[in-house]
Amino acid sequence: MDILLQVNPFSSVCGFICHHPCESECRRKEIDSPVSLRQLKRFVVEHTKEHRVQSRKKAASTTGKKVAIIGSGPSGLAAAKDLALLGHQVTVFEKQQVLGGMLANAIPRYRLPLDALHEDIADILASGVEARTGCEVGKDLPFDQLRSDYDAVLISVGLAESSSLPIPGVESKGVLLGIPFLWDTANGFAPEIGDRVLIVGGGNVAIDVARTAKRLGPSTVYMACLESRKEMPAWKWEIEEAEEEGIVIMNSWGPKAILHQDGKTCGIEFKRCTRVFDENRRFSPQYDESEITTVEVDSVILTIGQRANLEFIKGTPVAVDGGRLVFDRETLKTSEAGVFASGEVITGPGSAVQAVATGHNAARVIDHYLKTGEVMKLEPTTLETIGELPKKTADKAKKFDRVEVGLSAAAERVKDFAPIERAYTESEALAEARRCLACATGAVLDPKALCAGCLTCVRVCPFGVATVDQTAFMPAQECLTCGLCAAECPAAGIRLGRFATNNMKEGINLILEKMDVSRISRPFVVSYCCLYETTSRKYLRPQTEKEIEESGILRIMAPCVGRLGSLDLLAPFELGADKVMVIACKEHGCFYTGAEELLGRRIKGVRQFLDELKVGQNNLLFFPTTGSAEESWPQLWEEARKAAAQADAAQSGS
């Protein structure tokens, strides 16, 4: 949770509404489908609420600099938190009575419950950010005064107003604008829309408007847009969900006139749109005026674009051109020194997580400006990438279905504004997390290792990744971190960047050296358990000393017991264990092809060695999980302890 909040102060919000661009980059998609990162993050957020509250801490104002932020959407508040943590005194000015901007006042509640937003805002305010709600800059407080009172100003007002259309009939009763419609509905003032409603627009806001309208009870809701189905700017899954709810989408139609009778809307006339963009992808619609259609409706909601209300800077040195704020993309500065901008007011319509990103950038340039008096250019963010997963590797990987929670039934969800998607259960989250390939953390040859080029790694790699040219080499973009080469390497020279098991002895010793080993119930069993078989956090939590003493079981969770090397299997005996158990996945259930067979061979070899040491091969036990870990493991532990007790009794009797 701490990691999530470091990069995204709106982690709760994004758990519900993020369009998850990270998933489209997930290399798991080359095997089956991407890991559900949004749902996993939501699970983390929803199960760490107490920790989150306890971790809140006010940052000290150490720089003596004051920053004013106009607008409390995700960009403004993200910048506010960053600047507060950097030691600046930050005040957010919001003309509405609540913080959150469009998140609080326009995003439908079926998509974003207010509780999630309030959690994020509480974190931000706890960092030391001051908020003045119900204060409209330009009306309650002149912009020039604000500028003189603060060392820097950030304009982050978003795009809170809807654009209209210059067509006949647009002034008729029953013609509404999309953003005000969402705003009124979210705040409990839903307008009368009649039995038949048509939304003009094809973007995500239009989808929100259509689905919101559907929940107000009309029998028919239409969406009409210039774009073809493939060209619609709305996200694919939003379009599909809207259609599931009965929204009728009319593609490639442009509004020609709104029809009315006695001043009241009664229909809308369309002309066929034959092209939306020209050859340079500029908006340049063309129509076939000979193809006309008319739809009878009681109301029309226009959702064809958004704009910012910049009246508060009218007559100030902050330049506006054609209704748009003038700013420098490299520095985010406006035409007035010390005044910067972020969020949709400069980027245009986007997602919450994109707005957060511009807020982070704004905080960086403002912090630099306050400390140096100079304007900093934002360098393009370049992240090191590992490249696509090669097909030859993907084809050899086991497929595991993505864990989908699905939505509530369409017929039920349109009845109210209750959230339509539940979170993962604990078992679902663990199952989905297991699908992660741990990219770029795979096998690497220790430069100090005495690699003999024996080809063991080549023989055991289930993905055909390892190669040997004098020494072993595992390409990072191909390795899927199974760890089998590390477990089998006779020189013990291969390391894993993540999930390594070559320090098991050290880990067990750290636990035992804090205990009075003589108090542990005998026989003392060290049990290596496959982490991937857990369906709850029960066995992911560290054991207490009392639990170990009373049960006689020290549980060691291994991320795939197939990674355990021979030394890992022997180490517990050296540290005083009477028995060692290895509990693997269900039969044929291992994530990695061949891991079970190789582990079995390893155990056989160690057992022979135990006989030679007079320890006895029967003291190394191997079991597959027979059901859920929570049900089967205690039974297996009990069996092992009983068998050990019987063996000890028999030995004493002889």
Where are these regions (language model features)?
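Iron-sulfur cluster-binding cysteine motifs and their immediate structural context
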Residues: 1-2, 15-44, 91, 95-98, ...
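N-terminal Rossmann-like dinucleotide/flavin-binding domain of flavoprotein oxidoreductases
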Residues: 1-8, 15, 21, 40, ...
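Flanking helices and flexible, charged tails adjoining ferredoxin-like Fe-S electron-transfer domains
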Residues: 41-66, 103-104, 108-130, 139, ...
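Glycine-rich dinucleotide-binding loop and its adjacent helix/turn
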Residues: 44-60, 122-139, 162-216, 320-335
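N-terminal Rossmann-like FAD-binding beta1-loop-alpha1 element of flavoenzymes
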Residues: 66-91, 206-214
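Rossmann-like dinucleotide-binding cores of NAD(P)H-dependent redox enzymes
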Residues: 92, 96-127, 131, 183-185, ...
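FAD-site-proximal beta/loop scaffold in flavoenzymes
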Residues: 171-194, 278-349
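A conserved FAD-binding loop/helix module that cradles the flavin
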Residues: 209, 342-373
